[in-house]
């Protein structure tokens, strides 16, 4: 019998392979691959665009993979299409590349009220599960991304990581550079030794909450459109991706 591999092991391996440089806007990021019916592609990209423009995606950069093409070890079947989109663990990889120790802790559902994040309502730690927590919560239909976009209040997917509080200034510089590069997915940066969105952090640590990369997929699911997402799929050079507003469908 094969040993179980908790999702944290895969996350840490992929973090180490991230080469993205926000200042140069070059390098490899971690992407999720979504498989959809080709006939739904135009509508799905429209929904993804809504999520991006509402600040509910990791990055506006995407790539469409056509039927018959292959990305990583995923081959797109006839009458299907693939969409590669940024995974939030890319943020951890960029922090790590900058020499900042970072430990992804958990994924969950965050309650938003009038545009402000209140608290995590449901969480799963990365070292306690063999599958991505955000996939679990999306499959249980616990999100209300549509309501969030329409009203400013709702429940979205997010995750949290810890870093040493002594690295705070450097963390803020790196996060600012990511925002300038289009990765405007930082939900909240906590104070040292203080809870973040109701979740306790370790001693001499600070928490960083980031919007989950699967919120656009949750929006599609809420609209009763079939979508099969494979989180933490591969690393992809960002220069192979284009802004969602420039995608040719």
Describe the residue ranges of each PLM region.
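Conserved mixed alpha/beta catalytic, RNA-binding, or beta-rich assembly cores of soluble enzyme
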Residues: 1-13, 22-249
């Amino acid at each position: 019998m094969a040993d179980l591999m908790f999702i944290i092991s895969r996350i840490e391996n992929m973090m180490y392979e991230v080469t993205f440089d926000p200042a140069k806007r070059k390098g490899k990021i971690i992407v999720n691959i979504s498989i959809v019916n080709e006939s739904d592609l135009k509508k799905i990209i429209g929904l993804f665009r809504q999520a991006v423009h509402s600040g509910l995606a990791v990055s506006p950069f995407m790539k469409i993979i056509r039927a018959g093409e292959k990305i990583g070890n995923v081959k797109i079947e006839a009458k299907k299409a693939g969409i590669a989109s940024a995974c939030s663990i890319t943020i951890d990889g960029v922090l790590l590349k900058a020499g900042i120790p970072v430990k992804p802790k958990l994924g969950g559902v965050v309650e938003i009220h009038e545009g402000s994040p209140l608290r995590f309502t449901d969480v799963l730690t990365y070292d306690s599960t063999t599958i991505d927590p955000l996939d679990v919560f999306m499959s249980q239909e616990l999100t209300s991304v549509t309501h969030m976009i329409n009203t400013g209040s709702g429940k979205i997917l997010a995750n949290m990581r810890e870093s040493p509080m002594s690295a705070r200034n450097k963390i803020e510089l790196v996060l600012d550079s990511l925002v300038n590069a289009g990765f405007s997915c930082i939900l909240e940066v906590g104070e040292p030794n203080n809870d973040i969105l109701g979740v306790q952090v370790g001693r001499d640590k600070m928490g960083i909450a980031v919007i989950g990369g699967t919120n656009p997929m949750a929006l599609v699911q809420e609209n009763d459109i079939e979508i099969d997402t494979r989180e933490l799929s591969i690393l992809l050079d960002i220069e192979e991706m284009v802004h969602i507003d420039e995608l040719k469908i």
